[in-house]
């Protein structure tokens, strides 16, 4: 049985966006599942769009996501080089084969002449086809002119796509196209076919936008006498409204931005796997190992998948909750509030253990934890905005805080003892938990939410808790 080999072949033209990552994830999952090879190839032949540093950004993004490659930049392999600009000699060999077999010719026309052909076709209200202007006696190709593919046969192609099923396209999609540009570099249409064949790629998995070009690819495969690989086109990632492809105007961001915003790599991969694939069950949260085990191309949907950032945040929260506390501690090093800098690691881990379940992203950490490191300034508008507390007059709230202060002064400061003291306060004040606990929580944190009150007070400690209660009492409105 032939070993499965897949690839991801990005162009270094800028940041990696969501669609790029999914185009890397699906072939990576398939290769990992089948114990095959996953090749990273940098398609850098379009020098006009080349962005300095983009290759390094691609590599670092894949590193962060945990998408490792069997062959490619940094790791090498038997099928290198893995940058197309370093493979010119390979394209020259295959180009010469096409010339020798009568399937390629040097393009003798100037841009002005080509434009004249286009203008004439437009005036005659017909489609412009380059094959209608093939030179009868083209010059010998010396590498300074563009080299064009001479489509051998104008026919309808039918092929099977592992996701989309049987597809067909007619002669209207076929025309003579450039194989090698005048700068000596190949076009994508030519280079990727040569590279995939020489690198032993068995499954070509890419975006749906490539379907329209399939007839020209298939024609070139046949002219090169190369067996077709398995093709799989992934459905579009749609904007939230489901009406168009996701774009920058719809809030599409680079993966690096999501990383900065505190999204976990495993959550991002889980989310992107669900953009067009499911395992047929109700399961939504997957580990990387589960994705590798369950992934299959026949479970990839044909229709577009909506990009729902709220779902990404939900998944991220789920993955944060699953992390071991020491692992999470390593990941939040750069997300702590500045006031945490002098705290011990032991104390920060204790704080993290309390707030872990409330984090949707790592950037939520400062808001969820800052009051553990510095006494906040009282904000009594939070009491008036609270559904339970706004029913009580400020004087009543101050009285409750005084009672709580008195009770907690004589309480051992561990969660169980604090809970018992709070229960006693409920009985003595006749208040509901929602009212009593809310005012104490506000007084010590001035935050809309906090972990369980006994745990919060115990971690703050008796001295800090009593001091904050007293500050709240002293600052309480008188009317």
Tell me the role of every PLM-derived stretch.
Residues 27, 58, 98, 102, ...:
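Residue-level signal for inorganic ion chemistry
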Residues 413-476:
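Charged substrate- and nucleic-acid-binding regions of tRNA-handling and nucleotidyl-transfer enzymes
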Residues 81-85, 180-181, 199-211, 238-271, ...:
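Conserved phosphate-binding loops in nucleotide/dinucleotide-binding enzymes
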Residues 1-121, 212-226:
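N-terminal Rossmann-like or analogous alpha/beta NTP/dinucleotide-binding catalytic cores
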Residues 325-429:
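Small-residue-rich helix-loop
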Residues 16-18, 258-266, 302-308, 342-351, ...:
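Structural motif
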Residues 32-44, 190-203, 224-238, 451-454, ...:
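Glycine-rich phosphate/pyrophosphate-binding loops
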Residues 97, 105-233, 239-246, 254, ...:
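Active-site cores that bind ATP or allylic diphosphates and position pyrophosphate for catalysis
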């Amino acid at each position: 049985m032939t070993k499965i080999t897949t690839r991801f072949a990005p162009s270094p033209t800028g940041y990696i966006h969501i669609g790029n990552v999914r185009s890397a994830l699906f072939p990576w999952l398939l290769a990992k599942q089948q114990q095959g090879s996953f090749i990273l190839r940098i398609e850098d032949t379009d020098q006009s769009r080349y962005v300095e540093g983009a290759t390094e950004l691609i590599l670092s993004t894949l590193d962060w996501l945990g998408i490792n490659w069997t062959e490619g930049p940094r790791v090498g392999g038997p099928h290198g080089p893995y940058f197309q600009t370093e493979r010119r000699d390979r394209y020259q060999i295959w180009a010469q084969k096409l010339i020798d077999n009568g399937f390629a010719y040097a393009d003798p026309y100037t841009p002005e002449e080509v434009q004249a052909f286009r203008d004439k076709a437009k005036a005659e209200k017909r489609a412009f086809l380059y094959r209608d202007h093939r030179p009868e006696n083209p010059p010998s190709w010396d590498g300074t002119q563009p080299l064009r593919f001479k489509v051998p046969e104008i026919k309808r192609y039918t092929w099977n796509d592992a996701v989309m099923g049987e597809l067909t396209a007619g002669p209207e999609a076929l025309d003579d196209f450039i194989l090698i540009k005048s700068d000596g570099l190949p076009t994508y249409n030519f280079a990727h076919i040569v590279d995939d064949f020489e690198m032993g790629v068995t499954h070509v998995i890419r975006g749906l936008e490539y379907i329209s070009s399939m007839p020209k690819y298939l024609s070139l495969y046949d002219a090169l006498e190369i067996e077709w690989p398995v093709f799989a086109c992934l459905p579009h990632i749609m904007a939230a409204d489901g009406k168009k492809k996701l774009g920058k105007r719809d809030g599409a961001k680079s993966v690096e931005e999501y990383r900065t915003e505190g999204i976990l790599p495993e959550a991002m991969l889980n989310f992107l796997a669900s953009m067009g694939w499911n395992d047929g069950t109700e399961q939504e949260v997957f580990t990387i190992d589960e994705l590798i085990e369950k992934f299959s191309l026949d479970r990839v949907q044909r229709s577009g998948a909506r990009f729902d950032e709220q779902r990404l945040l939900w998944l991220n929260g789920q993955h944060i909750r699953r992390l071991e506390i020491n692992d999470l501690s390593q990941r939040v090093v750069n997300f702590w509030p500045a006031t945490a800098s002098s705290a011990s690691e032991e104390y920060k881990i204790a704080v993290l253990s309390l707030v872990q379940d409330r984090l949707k992203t790592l950037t939520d950490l400062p808001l969820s934890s800052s009051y553990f490191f510095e006494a906040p300034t009282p904000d009594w508008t939070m009491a008036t905005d609270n559904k339970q507390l706004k029913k009580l007059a400020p004087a009543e709230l101050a009285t409750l805080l005084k009672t709580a202060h008195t009770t907690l002064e004589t309480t051992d400061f561990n969660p169980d003892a604090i809970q018992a003291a709070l229960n006693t306060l409920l009985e003595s004040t006749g208040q509901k938990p929602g009212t009593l606990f809310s005012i104490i929580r506000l007084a010590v944190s001035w935050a809309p939410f906090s972990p369980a009150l006994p745990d919060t007070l115990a971690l703050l400690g008796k001295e800090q808790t009593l001091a904050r209660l007293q500050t709240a009492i002293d600052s309480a409105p008188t009317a």
